[in-house]
């Protein structure tokens, strides 16, 4: 049933590739989509330049464009409406970016990476369960989270967290592990929480 809903008399789409049960099933005017996997991109109608590889990846995307979803359920709930929101997101990994609905420009790599982001924009999440643990990044923007279960502010922005189970704070650079952290508040005085132990 791939591309089954198309009326080849009236449809104006072109350059689409769909492989899998109901992949790209509803495309009407969307262009240059590559959809591989059962139900991959099956709600796309007008969206274009999307790549979906994996079961239900980009499953509810209707009009979003320029998204890359690789992995089962990656970006599954992106753009459930007919608008052009949820664009230019990249999600690689099982359930990476699962809940992104209208977010733009998120770069998510790893199993469960950024899977609770909904409207957040321009976030970078790299690692297992990043952005999903302590504070559950949802609508915050421009956060950079790297490591194992590193999380950021749910609704705030400009947090950088690197390490093991680190909880990043808005306008702070935090790295280390949960029990032993070093921070720098770059919003105010940019002082480090610990001075150097270098011997002069």
Where are these regions (language model features)?
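Glycine- and small/polar-enriched repetitive beta-structure motifs of secreted/surface proteins
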Residues: 1-198
